[in-house]
Each structure stands twice: as C-alpha cells, then as structure tokens.
Swiss-Prot record:
A GO term, aspect molecular function: rRNA binding
Protein name, entry field: tRNA/tmRNA (uracil-C(5))-methyltransferase
Keywords, alphabetical: Methyltransferase, S-adenosyl-L-methionine, Transferase, tRNA processing
Organism: Saccharophagus degradans (strain 2-40 / ATCC 43961 / DSM 17024)
Residues at the active site: 323 (nucleophile), 357 (proton acceptor)
Gene name as annotated: trmA
Stored NCBIfam families: trmA_only (TIGR02143)
Recorded superkingdom: Bacteria
Catalysed reactions, as listed in the record: uridine(54) in tRNA + S-adenosyl-L-methionine = 5-methyluridine(54) in tRNA + S-adenosyl-L-homocysteine + H(+); uridine(341) in tmRNA + S-adenosyl-L-methionine = 5-methyluridine(341) in tmRNA + S-adenosyl-L-homocysteine + H(+)
Length: 365
C-alpha cells in the first residue's frame, strides 16, 4: 500500500484508513452493526522500533528490507525511512556513515535494530555473525557517544550491553503519566501514538465496571498500569520472564499498589482457577479473595484457544484487544453465545499495510 518499502504516503492515508474501516464493518457484521470507533495514526514518523538487514557489497553496507513473502530478495533502502520515528530517521544515516568507515564495526554485521521513545531516547542493537572482541567494544563505545544512543552488540551466545538494554517511555492517560521500561528484546507496541489511544479507549470503556480485573498476556504491563485505576485489585498473568520483570519494575516505578503479577500461561491459570492443580507460583496469591468482574485479553496473532475462550466467558465483562481480525472473528463466534458486543474499535497501528488492530468490549447476556 506504500509506493516504496518503509516510506509513508500521507496523501493516501485517509483512503487506506477508510478501506480498513469498510473491511472491518463487513467482516464483523454478524457481531456488530453499530459504528466502529476509528482511531487514526499519525500519517508518518509513527514507528518507534524497526529492524533492518544489513546488505554488504564490497566494503560498503546498506540497510535492506523485504517485501512480504519475498525474504530472499532484499531491497536496499535508498530513501528516507519516513514511517520511522524522527529519532530513527536521524540515527540511520549517521550510524551507516560510521559503520562504513570502520571495518571492525561493518565486517559481518548482518542486522541493526532501533528502539526509540517519544522523548528521543534510543537503544541501537548491532547483530553480527562473528565473536565480539574488546576492540569492537572500544569502537562501539565511541559510536554510542557520537550518536547519543545506547548500543548493544549481539552475536551467537553473546550479548554486550555498553550502558543499558532498555528505554523508558512515558504515555499520558486521563491526565496521568505512566512510565514504562521497554526492554530491547521484549515486545512493545510499535506505534506510540496509537498505543496511547488504545490505552485511553480501554480506560474509558472500563470506567464504571468496578470489582477486580484479571488480565491474560500482560506483557510489560502496558494496559495493566492505567487499567488498575478503574478496579479494586488486578491479577495479571504473563509467561515470559523478561516481560514479568519489566512489568514488576513498571508497577513499582508508577506506584501501583493493587496489581499482582503471576508468571503463568492462560492454560495454567485456567487450571488454577478450576482447582485442578496447585502452583507454587501462586502460593502467595489467594484466588478466592478476588471478585473478578472483568477480564482483559491481548493475545498473540493465533488468538484464544478453546480453553481460554471458555475461561473468559465466565466473566461479566470482556475487553479483547486483537492484532488479527481473522482469529478475533473466530473467537467472537463462540464468545457471542454468552456475551454481546457493546463497543467495537479499529486502531491503525500499521498504516499502509493490511494490518488491522481491533478492540472489542463484550458484556454477559
């Protein structure tokens, strides 16, 4: 939907968004006939993270991307990556110039990853097909100073963090700033402007529900923190150790006193809630003490499995954030046997692509 890979096309932005809204209305007409709440993205400079292959020809390296499904045909970037955040656009040519001037930094470099924030903080990861030496580290330190970015070097069984491997992002929801540690290897929402709109939408939608909240797939606490203001207690589950550590840091950093994190999968949580088995990870958590009114899910692209569908259908209120409309439609076919859709939103996380991020509020019939 773009003329070139990685290039924004603001003149066509509204048309592509209208097309997504139309496709969403048609796909979900069996479940929702009302208006879809459409949340647009900035038309350019919206991606806070990006990764590039490094294509090498002779003594020169280039940034390269791939068309979907054509992963053996790299396209070298000879134009500005205008979907990228301003900080990424600023870093890319400066980094390339320094790398190409240094055989030590350039040789066997095969991938570069950028992670940035709305305040201009950044981590830049250089990934190599070679062991990283003290000499490399010395040049990488100079690179970090020159670019004012945190540098990480990665190779097989090697990770060298020169200063830190994370950034701290601040998003403001209902007038309250929330600060998030975003770790270089962890999942974060790539479009900060749209992420903030998603958080605000979820907070507004749950403003009067009360009771306790259970959240599955909580990640680094992205939704957990602002949603905690609307509930008495929050129990959030996450399987990734890295994400759990980040979530615990973010909870403490933001002074949220009513959130408990449990490192377990949705399947394990179902077993615990049903009393099928006991988990040492829950030894300090009294599940019977919770009065769950609402469940929040933001699953991976595969959507919810049957057991998790059955689990969340117990709750009076369901907030479902989906990155895959097809699996959302499949899940709604079952969830709408017990619940009805009250609100439906479309978030344009990835302009100029076919990707559609959706949010649905369901209440028990």
């Amino acid at each position: 939907m773009t003329t070139k890979l990685g290039q924004a096309n603001p003149a066509n932005y509204q048309q592509q968004l209208d097309d997504k809204e139309k496709a969403t209305k048609e796909q979900f007409s069996d479940f929702w006939q009302g208006d879809i709440e459409v949340h647009p993205s900035p038309p350019s400079h919206y991606r806070m993270r990006a990764e590039f292959k490094m294509w090498q020809q002779g003594a020169e390296a280039f940034y390269a991307m791939y068309q979907p499904g054509e992963y053996k045909k790299p396209v070298t970037l000879e134009w500005e990556f205008s979907v990228g955040a301003e900080k990424i656009v600023e870093l890319m040519p400066k980094l390339l110039e320094i790398v190409n001037a240094s055989e030590l930094l350039r040789k066997r470099l095969f991938q570069v990853e950028f992670l940035t924030t709305t305040t201009g903080e950044s981590v830049t990861t250089l990934i190599y097909h070679k062991p990283l030496t003290e000499e490399w580290q010395a040049e990488a330190n100079a690179l970090a100073s020159s670019l004012n970015t945190h540098i990480i070097g990665r190779s097989k069984k090697q990770k060298i963090v020169l200063t830190q491997d994370y950034v701290e992002e601040t998003l403001t929801i209902s007038g309250t700033p929330f600060t998030y540690k975003q770790i270089e290897s962890g999942f974060t929402q790539p479009n900060a402007a749209v992420c903030q709109k998603m958080l605000q939408w979820a907070v507004d939608a749950t403003a009067n529900l009360g009771g306790d909240l259970v959240e599955l797939y909580c990640g680094n606490g992205n939704f957990t923190l602002p949603l905690s203001k609307n509930f008495d207690k929050v129990l959030a589950t996450e399987v990734s150790k890295t994400s759990v550590k980040a979530a615990e840091y973010n909870i403490e950093k933001n002074g949220c006193k009513n959130i408990t994190i449990a490192r377990m999968s949705s399947e394990e949580f179902t077993e615990a809630l049903n009393g099928v088995r006991e988990f040492r990870r829950l030894k300090d958590i009294e599940l019977d003490s919770y009065n769950f009114s609402t469940v929040f899910v933001d699953p991976p692209r595969a959507g919810l499995d049957e057991d998790t569908e059955a689990l969340i259908s117990r709750f009076d209120n369901i907030i479902y954030i989906s990155c895959n409309p097809d699996t959302l439609a499949n899940n709604l076919a079952n969830l709408c046997k017990t619940h009805k859709v009250e609100r439906f939103a479309l978030f344009d996380q990835f302009p100029y692509t076919d990707h559609r991020e959706c949010g649905v509020i369901l209440t028990k019939k």
